[in-house]
UniProtKB/Swiss-Prot annotation:
Protein name per UniProt: Adenylate kinase
Catalytic activity entry: AMP + ATP = 2 ADP
Residues bound to Zn(2+): 130, 133, 150, 153
Record-linked Gene3D superfamilies: P-loop containing nucleotide triphosphate hydrolases (3.40.50.300)
One family name in Pfam for this protein: ADK_lid
Record-stated family: Belongs to the adenylate kinase family.
Residues that coordinate or bind ATP: 10-15, 127, 136-137, 199
Length: 215
């Protein structure tokens, strides 16, 4: 089973990816992990990527695509895989499509965990973390017993910079602009599947399993 996982920041992709990987015994492949591995091992592609990153530049599609292609040819991918964070653009999706066609393979589905922007804002801006022990809370869904204090150690809990309204809105905006063409691309290929990401974690996973059973 070959799956591309799509969804906005705060949609719970990481949680669902882990569950899918465990249930179907396929590797969860994230572009972040691929980049870190190539860079830490000083592979030719890793060194090329680092040369761009050190200058504060975006790594070209060609480098990212070749890293992903190399990863998909490893032995643990023979029975399938779950791609998380790739493709990010239509050009990358087309490159993946071509790679699969050349191997007489095909993608089973592009799975979109759909969550409205207002819900993401509520979910992400309400997160709080303890300054001492790292305990996590949510002012709406998992509030501390004493306002502003950690249940575990009594230290202050704070909002991370990544979780401010301005930052979250910016991330959602970037996602929308980047991913909408990708969603249309997979729709046109009849490969797009959608689940409602506002449901409880277990219910979202149950819906995903039902969808994957239809592939």
């Amino acid at each position: 089973m070959k799956i591309v996982l799509l969804g906005p920041p705060g949609a719970g992709k990481g949680t669902q990816a882990k569950s899918i990987s465990n249930r179907y015994s396929i590797p969860h492949i994230s572009t972040g992990d691929i980049f870190r591995k190539n860079i830490s091992e000083n592979t030719p592609l890793g060194m090329e990527a680092r040369s761009y990153m050190d200058k504060g530049l975006l790594v070209p599609d060609e480098v990212t695509i070749n890293m992903v292609k190399d990863r998909l040819q490893e032995e643990d991918c023979l029975s399938g895989y779950l791609l998380d964070g790739f493709p990010r653009t239509v050009a990358q999706a087309e490159a993946l499509n071509e790679f699969l066609e050349n191997r007489n393979e095909q993608l089973d589905t592009a799975l979109l965990i759909d969550v409205p922007s207002e819900f993401i804002l509520d979910r992400m801006t309400g997160r709080r973390v303890c300054t001492s022990c790292g305990g996590s809370f949510h002012i709406k869904f998992n509030p501390p017993t004493i306002d502003g204090k950690c249940n575990l150690c009594g230290s202050d809990i704070v909002q991370r910079k990544d979780d401010t309204v301005e930052t979250v809105k910016e991330r959602i905006d970037v996602y929308d602009k980047q991913t909408q063409p990708l969603i249309e691309f997979y729709k046109s290929k009849n490969l797009l599947s959608m689940v409602d990401g506002t449901k409880a974690i277990d219910q979202v996973f149950e819906d995903i399993c039902k969808l994957l059973g239809e592939q």
